[in-house]
From Swiss-Prot:
NCBIfam families: hemC (TIGR00212). It comes from Arabidopsis thaliana (Mouse-ear cress). The gene is HEMC. Heat stable and fully active up to 70 degrees Celsius. Monomer. Inhibited by NH(3), heavy-metal ions, hydroxylamine and 2-bromoporphobilinogen. Not inhibited by N-ethylmaleimide. Binds 1 dipyrromethane group covalently. The active site is at residue 157. Its main location: plastid. The modification Phosphoserine is found at residue 123. It is an enzyme of class 2 (transferase). Residues 1-62 form a transit peptide. This is Porphobilinogen deaminase, chloroplastic. Tetrapolymerization of the monopyrrole PBG into the hydroxymethylbilane pre-uroporphyrinogen in several discrete steps.
Length: 382
């Protein structure tokens, strides 16, 4: 393991001071070895060993810590530079090495960090920035232009329409889709006193919180990576926050969790907990590599959920949740939700059918069309 990989779980611990009633333990927030990112209170002594290069196309190319290429890389992985994004890139790299002996040699796989629009604009809520692909566009452009060979994305960030000249032939096995409640003074949302502020940039989370707990307040401009948001919580900017349990597991930071919300309490985002890996349409070699890693059960579930999202034309301005899973009999169970941003109205639906691609896509679309019809014009403007 190189220094960059180990830094995710070792260096620079930040202690969250809990109140007497809290069930939250102290945590190790880790450090990031990345170029071109300003992450508060996070540093690494390995940074000095990296060099930053500016390409003619304007995107930042960066090595990760001391991950030096000993020869021309067979695969260049493009990723964002957050600790979670790097953890996902490392997971991809290790799975490729396990499957393909020719990729084991040092330098055979190189990681390129690319800064996205969502990384650059941190002062506004995502809903105010607008547009799609806030965390993927620049990485996809690097892929199309040949600067990288594969792009590792959090699937929940991937627009329903992929950029031209790209395909997404691989979903890694999905992590836990539920949301985690993080708080220094209470174990659950229900225990928070009236007027407490919950920090989340997600309209999906905001609408479901306010629907069930209208006495709480939500701070929308609560952005940044996991470490940054935990630091804001520690600093008293908010009393609690919700984070994807999948990300906390990948960062080995579940000790921060006060409780885990059930699917009835908080339906997840479409594709939450899933990693998607894209390549160029004409790159058969990379497509073959990625196909060898694909987890078909995850891919089918994501296809159902994204068909639902596409039907609703969902974006960061729309509170939408959806989750497809396989039951004990092997059937697909899909649950979908749309809400008004203020949480006063929530519409839900569900479907059950064969766990087969065509049937699951049809279920997702049908569920989306039902909720569109029930919502009516002006629903999302409330």
């Amino acid at each position: 393991m190189d220094i960059a990989s180990s830094s995710l779980s070792q260096a620079h611990k930040v202690v969250l001071t809990r109140q007497p009633s809290s069930r939250v333990n102290t945590c190790s927030l880790g450090s990031v070895s990345a170029i071109g990112f300003s992450l508060p209170q996070i540093s690494s002594p390995a940074l000095g060993k990296c060099r930053r290069k500016q390409s003619s196309s304007g995107f930042v190319k960066a090595c990760v810590a001391v991950e030096q290429k000993t020869r021309t890389a067979i695969i260049r992985i493009g990723t964002r530079g957050s600790p979670l994004a790097l953890a996902q890139a490392y997971e991809t790299r290790e799975k490729l090495k396990k499957k393909h002996p020719e990729l084991v040699e040092d330098g055979a796989i190189h990681i390129e960090i690319i800064k996205t629009t969502g990384d650059k604009i941190l002062s506004q809520p995502l809903a105010d920035i607008g547009g799609k692909g806030l965390f993927t566009k620049e990485i996809d452009e690097a892929l199309i232009n040949g600067h990288i060979d594969i792009a590792v994305h959090s699937m929940k960030d991937v627009p329903t329409y992929l950029p031209e000249k790209t395909i997404l032939p691989c979903n890694l096995p999905r992590e836990d889709v539920r949301d985690a409640f993080i708080c220094l003074t209470a174990a659950t949302l229900a225990e928070l006193p009236a007027g407490s502020v919950v920090g989340t940039a997600s309209l999906r989370r905001k609408s479901q919180i306010l629907h069930k707990y209208p006495a709480l307040h939500v701070e929308e401009n609560f952005r940044g990576n996991v470490q940054t948001r935990l630091s804001k919580l520690q600093g008293g900017k908010v009393q609690a926050t919700l984070l994807a349990l999948a990300g906390l597991k990948r960062l080995s930071m579940t000790e921060n969790v006060a409780s885990i919300l059930s699917l009835d309490e908080m339906l997840p985002a479409v594709a939450q907990g899933a990693i998607g890996i894209a390549c160029r349409t004409d790159d058969d070699k990379m497509a073959t590599y990625l196909a060898s890693l694909n987890h078909e059960e995850t891919r089918l579930a994501i296809s159902c959920e994204r068909a639902f999202l596409e039907t609703l034309d969902g974006s960061c301005r729309t509170p939408i949740a959806g989750y497809a899973s396989k039951d004990e009999e092997g059937n697909c169970i899909f649950r979908g939700l749309v809400a008004s941003p203020d949480g006063t109205k929530v519409l839900e639906t569900s479907r059950k059918g064969p766990y087969v691609y065509e049937d699951m896509v049809k279920m997702g679309k049908d569920a989306g069309q039902e909720l569109l019809s029930r919502a009516g014009p002006g629903f999302f403007g409330n």
